UniProtKB/Swiss-Prot annotation:
Originating species: Homo sapiens (Human)
Positions of the record's site feature: Cleavage: V468, A469
UniProt motif (Microbody targeting signal) ranges: 658-660
Pathway assignment: Lipid metabolism; peroxisomal fatty acid beta-oxidation
Modified positions (Phosphoserine) in chain numbering: S26, S649
Listed GO CC annotations: cytosol; membrane; peroxisomal matrix; peroxisomal membrane; peroxisome
Binding site for FAD: T139, G178
Record's protein name: Peroxisomal acyl-coenzyme A oxidase 1
UniProt function note: Involved in the initial and rate-limiting step of peroxisomal beta-oxidation of straight-chain saturated and unsaturated very-long-chain fatty acids. Catalyzes the desaturation of fatty acyl-CoAs such as palmitoyl-CoA (hexadecanoyl-CoA) to 2-trans-enoyl-CoAs ((2E)-enoyl-CoAs) such as (2E)-hexadecenoyl-CoA, and donates electrons directly to molecular oxygen (O(2)), thereby producing hydrogen peroxide (H(2)O(2)).
Length: 660
């Protein structure tokens, strides 16, 4: 054990194990998660060479092999609980992504949410066992987040009771679905449903694309890999072109909308019911943002405790770089953010399951807010985590640029989440639509509930945005509850400003659509403020549920740091709204620095509580034992370029040197 890390752990003010239990949900869940981790880490079938030193084709082959092993092992170990399946899947490929991932994260959830009982009986068991390997083909070359623009068609033929699928243009070719290129044999395809000469919009169809047994593409199917990407080397993101490809009528997912044998269309009870899969995945992505940022913080903070550099006082030993205030200022707000997102991710998961149960009983009342909240928080957390991971990499100096740090892999595998499952700016604008509807409800004298209930407090007589400067508040910068109130006022103010500016543009432009576009910057800012408020609120409320006094104290410091750092970065919003005064902002900036000092002695223990095993981090710099330099040298020796003393390419240089 590196002596610096031992000293850091010995000086912690709390027991990291107890905090791990809180993050997992209970001591029993921690025990079971570790049990599953050890099943994998101690199983020779799951061992493989360092993927960093393999070609893309080799990495893909390793990933497919391990995915097949994963399914067999889950059967062998009797793992069926959804949480346990998730833990197992995360660990079997460690820091990398899997070609069959969309089978479990999109294909099966969509089948569960939108399939009839008969459809689930037909496909569910086979897809869980990978006899059917599914993907989710929504995005096209020409359209992504704008779903109504998708061009793929599914035209019903009543004579044969089949749908005929076509990709009528080059831009209609399905593009990007993970596992589509070489792995999947089925896809849930989103296509424009046409029956009796009328288009009824997007619907989901289960489409066989490869022959089971030979894995060759079926007639009418052109399918392949889209080529190298920024990351995701282990996944065969693919393209799919369909030419008069026929599927049975029963392959349309018909839990809600239906097409009768004669071609009659039966519309769903509510169009919102088809949001199910998107809402599920977006709520899941909030937790993924927390996990990715937590990993990056673990690596950067441990390394900063091991790394000694420069001088604070001339002539004294080189200090740990974690002792520099600038390093603390880079990393500790991100650590606080990681904890905030952990708690928000758990809240979103619980909320999704609760509301989904209500939907199953016909209660759709909370679905609009859930849709808005998952869209906004997906964007807010992924943008923040994405920036934070890169900040952690740069905080590790030159070594952070090496793949041995693990940080480049974390970054390239996380950054797609800013654009997949809804491009983030568009997600923020979806949240803004809900905020504007809620504002209009309040303005018309109705009350709103849920996370937007703060809009009920808006005085109805206030018309001009500049008149917002009448908030009756005195913010206590040492009170999480008071800071939550400040964020609430900021959100209300920015929602109202966006609403008033939108109203002005509607009056001036006569077109709601043009007005919306010309107000979209204000609308995104309103959504960001709303999401920021939600995160602060949930973090603050979590403190009240913590029993252990030492853990509550350190989490309170993190909550204050998260909230105050956010104010310091958005001081203009709090000043313009007269939510806070200039002297208070000065106090905020000073308090942030005090909190850095307070958190310093617990920083390593706080990342230890995330409980990432070394193999999960995949980082030489973030090793639990802190023995960075010895292992850095050993890692470099394994580079394929070092297999021969003289590389074969020397022949190109030799002729130039023969003249010397």
């Amino acid at each position: 054990m590196n002596p610096d890390l031992r000293r850091e752990r010995d000086s912690a003010s709390f027991n990291p194990e107890l905090l791990t239990h809180i993050l997992d949900g209970s001591p029993e869940k921690t025990r079971r998660r570790r049990e599953i981790e050890n099943m994998i880490l101690n199983d020779p079938d799951f061992q493989h060479e360092d993927l960093n030193f393999l070609t893309r084709s080799q990495r893909y082959e390793v990933a497919v092999r391990k995915s097949a092993i994963m399914v067999k092992k889950m059967r062998e170990f009797g793992i069926a609980d959804p949480d346990e399946i998730m833990w197992f899947k995360k660990l079997h490929l460690v820091n990398f992504v899997e070609p069959v991932g969309l089978n479990y994260s999109m294909f099966i959830p969509t089948l569960l949410n939108q399939g009839t009982t008969a459809q689930k009986e037909k496909w569910l068991l086979s897809s869980k066992g990978l006899q059917i390997i599914g993907t989710y083909a929504q995005t096209e070359m020409g359209h992504g987040t704008h779903l109504r623009g998708l061009e793929t068609t599914a035209t019903y033929d009543p004579e044969t009771q089949e749908f005929i699928l076509n990709s009528p243009t080059v831009t209609s070719i399905k593009w990007w679905p993970g596992g589509l290129g070489k792995t999947s044999n089925h896809a849930i395809v989103l296509a424009q449903l046409i029956t009796k000469g009328k288009c009824y919009g997007l619907h989901a169809f289960i489409v066989p694309i490869r022959e089971i047994g030979t894995h060759k593409p079926l007639p009418g199917i052109t399918v392949g890999d889209i080529g190298p990407k920024f990351g995701y080397d282990e996944i065969d993101n693919g393209y799919l072109k369909m030419d008069n490809h026929r599927i049975p009528r029963e392959n349309m997912l018909m839990k809600y909308a239906q097409v009768k044998p004669d071609g009659t269309y039966v519309k769903p009870l509510s169009n919102k019911l088809t949001y199910g899969t998107m809402v599920f995945v977006r709520s899941f992505l909030v937790g993924e943002a927390a996990r990715a940022l937590s990993k990056a913080c673990t690596i950067a903070i441990r390394y900063s405790a091991v790394r000694h550099q420069s001088e604070i006082k001339p002539g004294e030993p080189e200090p740990q770089i974690l002792d520099f205030q600038t390093q603390q200022y880079k990393l500790f707000p991100l650590l606080a953010t990681a904890y905030a997102f952990q708690f928000v991710g758990a809240y979103m998961k619980e909320t999704y399951h609760r509301i989904n149960e209500g939907i199953g009983q016909g209660d759709l009342s909370e679905l609009p807010e859930l849709h808005a909240l998952t869209a906004g928080l997906k964007a807010f957390t992924s943008w923040t985590a994405n920036t934070g991971i890169e900040a952690c990499r740069m905080a590790c100096g030159g070594h952070g640029y090496s793949h041995c740090s693990g940080l480049p892999n974390i970054y390239v595998n996380f950054t797609p989440s800013c654009t997949f499952e809804g491009e983030n700016t568009v997600m923020m604008l979806q949240t803004a639509r809900f905020l504007m509807k809620s504002y209009d409800q309040v303005h018309s004298g109705k009350l709103v509930c849920g996370m937007v209930s703060y809009l009920n407090d808006l005085p109805s007589q206030r018309i001009q945005p500049q008149q917002v400067a009448v908030w009756p508040t005195m913010v206590d910068i040492n009170s999480p509850e008071s800071l939550t109130e400040a964020y609430k006022l900021r959100a209300a103010r920015l929602v109202e400003i966006a609403a008033k500016n939108l109203q002005k543009e509607v009056i001036h432009r006569k077109s709601k659509e043009v007005a919306w576009n010309l107000t979209s910057v204000d609308l995104v800012r309103a959504s960001e403020a709303h999401c920021h408020y939600v995160v602060v609120k949930l973090f603050s409320e979590k403190l009240l549920k913590i029993q252990d006094k030492a853990i509550q104290a350190v989490l309170r410091s993190l909550c204050l740091l998260y909230s105050l750092y956010g104010i310091s970065q958005n001081a203009g919003d709090f000043l313009q709204g007269s939510i806070m005064t200039e002297p208070q902002i000065t106090q905020v900036n000073q308090r942030v620095k005090e909190l850095l000092t307070l958190i310093r002695s617990d920083a390593v223990a706080l990342v230890d509580a995330f409980d990432f095993q070394d193999v999960t981090l995949g980082s030489v710099l973030g090793r639990y034992d802190g023995n960075v330099y010895e292992n850095l040298f050993e890692w470099a020796k394994n580079s394929p370029l070092n297999k021969a003393e003289v590389h074969e390419s020397y022949k190109h240089l030799k002729s130039l040197q023969s003249k010397l």
